[in-house]
UniProtKB/Swiss-Prot annotation:
A lipid is attached at residue 337 (S-palmitoyl cysteine). This is Neuropeptide Y receptor type 1. The keyword Transmembrane helix applies. Its main location: membrane. Keywords: Cell membrane, Disulfide bond, G-protein coupled receptor, Glycoprotein, Lipoprotein, Membrane, Palmitate, Phosphoprotein, Receptor, Transducer, Transmembrane, Transmembrane helix. GO terms for cellular component: neuron projection; plasma membrane. The keyword Iron-sulfur does not apply. InterPro entries: GPCR_Rhodpsn, GPCR_Rhodpsn_7TM, NPY1_rcpt, NPY_rcpt. Disulfide bonds join 112-197. It is a multi-pass membrane protein. It is found in: Cell membrane. The gene is NPY1R.
Length: 382
């Protein structure tokens, strides 16, 4: 790094280390400064995402935890996903926005290390929560008579995810540094006593190896696995619909199963789409940062980062849009009313492996009245 001209601070260009992505300090020309109107617009956008991310995920967590009948495998994993999104909204958005605009770190050494560490942990937890949800849906639909995860399995899976996330993020606690090194040869008064926060790996090869590993661990690998699971689910449901008899209850259950699968798949697709621009930006910058013009770096990074952060709002939006129970409970939540079980009002949706479809043999032997009772008893409430 050329500290004399100081055209850039060292890069933090990995998928999870988005908030510490290198800042270009183009103090030689005012042309590189963002217009006030653009800064104001970005501030409003970031503020809106923070508010939606925090309130939406907090409401979703509170509603699911308060309603005992909603504590099934899928909803437990949804709570874990929302909690990780909540951490990202709190620990990432405000710090990243301020750091990118100011081009120097003002939050102290402890936050310099904790900020990227917590962000990396949160994103790892988010993507692997989606993996576990895909596995749960796969077993429920593809192999209903085989092994099916229960609530205890979900808690164990969540614990394993957090351990994996913490271990894979440890390099940020080790190599993240707060230093004034880039400013030591700068004579401008505006940059005196200023610090930057970035990762200082032993070598570029170490950094590139680690960032490439995280790219596969946090994005491409899990998403490929998830889409394979949902593709198999789609094929099975399509065959089941073609073979399904014309019983109204069967058609109702099939419709509800399809709706909940669309909701879960939509969350995955939104995650992949939101994170794609920042993933491409970081990958390109990691391997050939000269491609990105100095004056366009901060604006381009903020736009990519803001798009990625929208993913923190997706979970409660899709969950609420496709779940009438959540919409009703959300009204109670914002009206500060007590949550209470409303068995008569809840729609029934086969969300969890805790209560799966009864076998075809038992359905054939059951009378229409008994069949309807089985359906009502076996469907999950979310």
């Amino acid at each position: 790094m050329n500290s004399t001209s100081f055209s850039q601070v060292e890069n933090h260009s990995i998928f999870c280390n988005f908030s510490e992505n290198s800042q270009f300090l183009a103090f030689e020309s005012d042309d590189c400064h963002l217009p006030l109107a653009m800064i104001f617009t970005l501030a409003l956008a970031y503020g809106a995402v923070i508010i939606l991310g925090v309130t939406g995920n907090l409401a979703l967590i509170m509603i699911i935890l308060k309603q005992k009948e909603m504590r099934n495998v899928t909803n437990i994993l949804i709570v874990n996903l929302s909690f990780s999104d909540l951490l990202v909204a709190i620990m990432c958005l405000p710090f990243t926005f301020v750091y990118t605009l100011m081009d120097h770190w003002v939050f102290g050494e402890a936050m310099c290390k904790l900020n990227p560490f917590v962000q990396c942990v949160s994103i790892t937890v988010s993507i692997f929560s989606l993996v576990l949800i895909a596995v749960e849906r796969h077993q429920l639909i593809i192999n209903p008579r085989g092994w099916r995860p229960n609530n205890r399995h979900a808690y164990v899976g969540i614990a394993v995810i957090w351990v994996l996330a913490v271990v894979s993020s440890l390099p940020f606690l080790i190599y993240q540094v707060l230093t004034d090194e880039p400013f030591q040869n700068v004579t401008l008064d505006a940059f005196k006593d200023k610090y930057v926060c970035f990762d200082k790996f032993p070598s570029d090869s170490h950094r590139l190896s680690y960032t490439t590993l995280l790219l596969m661990l946090q994005y491409f690998g899990p998403l490929c696995f998830i889409f394979i699971c949902y593709f198999k689910i789609y094929i099975r449901l399509k065959r089941r619909n073609n073979m399904m008899d014309k019983m109204r209850d069967n058609k109702y259950r099939s419709s509800e199963t399809k709706r909940i699968n669309i909701m879960l798949l939509s969350i995955v697709v939104a995650f992949a789409v939101c994170w794609l621009p920042l993933t491409i930006f970081n990958t390109v910058f990691d391997w050939n940062h000269q491609i990105i013009a100095t004056c366009n770096h901060n604006l381009l990074f903020l736009l990519c980062h803001l798009t990625a952060m929208i993913s923190t709002c997706v979970n409660p939006i899709f969950y609420g849009f496709l779940n009438k129970n959540f919409q009703r409970d959300l009204q109670f939540f914002f009206n500060f009313c007590d949550f209470r079980s409303r068995d008569d009002d809840y729609e029934t949706i086969a969300m969890s492996t805790m209560h799966t479809d009864v076998s075809k043999t038992s359905l054939k032997q059951a009378s229409p009245v008994a069949f309807k009772k089985i359906n009502n008893d076996d469907n999950e409430k979310i």
